[in-house]
């Protein structure tokens, strides 16, 4: 079985697709950052909502909607609290979570997805079935 090359991907991860914007934000961001964050809360909001930096670089908007929703989400994540995005299908929850993870940690694969019926126990203690099938029972498969 071969691994997918760049040509075979339908879409790159957010941190790859928008690498130039993330790098420009890092360079121009002198604001205080929470521990282990790549960008400040201001820069994370700018990354998602778009805007022009002091150096003239334009950051494209990833989310078109109520600015306050993004600001509240970023403020929540800047504390020690978790963030749960919920709503009807097709309202950009997965898209926003991917871009929040990319801007905050530099790794957009650090998200957990579930449905309204997914319990906390299932998220915390369930198996990663792809990992389980490929490598057998292990800590990585938990």
Predicted regions and their residues:
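AAA+ P-loop NTPase catalytic core and its hallmark functional loops
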Residues: 2-142
